[in-house]
A protein has these predicted regions:
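Conserved Rossmann-like nucleotide-binding pocket used by diverse enzymes
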Residues: 70, 93, 120, 163, ...
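Glycine-rich adenosyl-binding loop in Rossmann-like folds that engage adenosine-containing cofactors
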Residues: 28-56, 115, 120-175
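Short, glycine/acidic-enriched loop or turn micro-motifs at the edges of active sites
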Residues: 74-76, 99, 126, 184-186, ...
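Short amphipathic alpha-helical segments
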Residues: 81, 106-107, 132-133, 192-196, ...
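Conserved acidic-Pro-Pro-aromatic motif
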Residues: 22, 87-94, 166-251
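Short, hinge-like loop/turn segments at secondary-structure boundaries
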Residues: 110-112, 134-140, 218-226
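S-adenosyl-L-methionine
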Residues: 1-108, 112, 156-157, 173-174, ...
Length: 251
């Protein structure tokens, strides 16, 4: 199963959320627990058996069985379980900052026997500190996309404390790194700034989402990388919801 470095929700939280909000989705190869009213990822898993297949196809073609991956924004683990399968002799280091989503991530790693994944309920940036971030109450929502959750600092009494870490500091002793995969909902630049030493040392493949505001800034930040826009559309409503994605390779 996945190896978590954080305390799980207490029993009351688990009973409250799991009994009222969770459903099971079975695909051809995997089993997932998801929030029942979540939108895109759930629907894609149910219809197609995967989420963002083009991204996973790139991972399959590039990674080896002993590869190591850092995944920033693992969500419920729809990519994580596949990365675990691909890199069966390597390690996956997955970050997810949303408290409830982090619990689902760990549950899905357990259900799919992912023994090579380490999980962290921490935010990734270019600094190291503790902040209080907003907690999303999904129970009060009708339909939502929990994949849009991002770092939002609030006053202490309105949220929960979380470690903010840089990848350079977190993994200063790591011996191997083949891929950095980032889904940080507009926070990609601080994540990359905080990983510049790792990138310089290991020259990993970089798969990162971007938005139109930071596209050129990502390119400028790492001139030693060639960034290819591999944007594709979600399988559902694919004319409305573009998924903007960079593939970065060392020059």
């Amino acid at each position: 199963m996945g190896i978590s470095n954080n305390t799980m929700l207490d029993v009351n939280d688990l009973n409250h959320y799991y009994l009222q909000m969770i459903k099971e989705i079975k695909t051809k190869e995997h089993l997932f627990l998801v929030l029942e009213k979540d939108t895109f990822i759930n629907e894609c898993l149910e219809r197609y058996g995967y989420w963002e297949k083009p991204t996973m196809d790139i991972c399959r073609s590039y990674l080896k069985s002993d590869s190591s991956v850092i995944e920033v924004g693992a969500h419920i683990g729809s990519h994580t379980v596949i990365l675990s399968d691909i890199c069966k002799d390597g390690f996956i280091y997955s970050f997810e900052l949303q408290k409830l989503i982090f619990q689902l991530l760990n549950a899905n790693l357990l259900l799919n026997t992912c023994k090579n994944v380490y999980t962290y309920m921490e935010a990734v940036s270019d600094e190291n500190k503790i902040e209080c971030i907003a907690e999303i109450d999904y129970q009060t929502m009708d339909k939502f996309n929990s994949g849009l959750g991002s770092l939002k600092v609030v006053r202490q009494h309105k949220g929960y404390p979380i470690n903010i870490v840089s990848l350079d500091n977190k993994f200063s002793e790591i011996k191997k790194l083949d891929l950095i995969k980032i889904d940080a909902e507009g926070h990609e630049i601080p994540v990359l700034k905080g990983a510049k030493e790792l990138i310089k040392k290991f020259k990993p493949l970089i798969l990162t989402e971007f938005d139109l505001k930071n596209k050129q800034e990502i390119i400028n930040l790492l001139p030693e990388y060639k960034f290819e826009d591999i944007s594709y559309n979600y399988e559902l409503n694919n004319l409305i919801y573009p998924n903007l994605m960079f593939k970065g390779t060392p020059r």
